[in-house]
A protein has these predicted regions:
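Primary detection of the long, small/polar-rich alpha-helical "axial" segments characteristic
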Residues: 1-213
């Protein structure tokens, strides 16, 4: 029995198939820009690259988390700066009211402005938010806001931002603490407002310190 064959043609066909496959892989790598597109290209290399890719994406997200944290702190600081300006105005009014050149009508007008300013401090404390999270109403005073700035769960790169309640009650400048009906009342109000300003300055230092760390 005679079997006819063309060994050279068969080898050429086989080599052409191999070259076609290699060309396809080369085109795939060229078009994707990746040396490894599937486990068959390099199983060990793929495992390593995926691990590194996950780490890089985690670091990128941690960076975005840091920026969000900075934005949160800046929002709180902006509100606290406004509160500080109001406290300074309240102190100015109390000093004015302590002068006995004022008559009852004058002190009544000053008291109305003080009451309005106190209400504004309360409004700032209850409405200052970042991403619908209240910042100055005391919610962050105990639990704080934890910022994940590390790429992994076991990475100890976290920050905790705590912001105490900053309304008129916490600052001790309610209507009973800030009144200017008499010279003595106005003098007491000056002391109470000075204490409130000291509390503000302490909270502001904590915010700045947290941001630097």
């Amino acid at each position: 029995m005679i079997i006819n064959h063309n060994l050279n043609a068969m080898n050429a066909h086989r080599n052409m198939g191999i070259n076609t496959g290699n060309s396809g892989k080369a085109m795939e790598k060229l078009s994707s820009g990746l040396r490894i597109n599937r486990a068959g290209d390099d199983a060990a290399g793929l495992a390593i690259s995926e691990k590194m890719r996950g780490q890089i994406r985690g670091l990128n997200q941690a960076s975005r988390n840091s920026q969000d944290g900075i934005s949160l702190i800046q929002t709180a600081e902006g509100a606290l700066n406004e509160t500080h300006s109001i406290l300074q105005r309240m102190r100015e009014l109390s000093v004015q009211a302590a002068n006995d050149t004022n008559v009852t009508v004058d002190r009544d007008a000053i008291q109305k402005e003080l009451t309005s300013l106190t209400s504004e401090i309360d409004r700032i404390a209850t409405t200052t938010q970042f991403n619908e999270k209240n910042l100055l109403n005391g919610d962050l005073g105990t639990t704080g806001a934890k910022l994940q700035i590390g790429a992994n769960a076991d990475t100890a790169l976290t920050l905790e931002v705590k912001i105490a309640k900053m309304d008129s009650t916490a600052l001790t400048i309610t209507a009973t603490n800030v009144k200017v009906g008499t010279n003595a009342d106005a003098t007491t109000s000056i002391t109470n407002i000075n204490n409130a300003i000291k509390k503000y300055q302490l909270k502001d230092q904590v915010l700045v310190h947290t941001k630097i760390d």
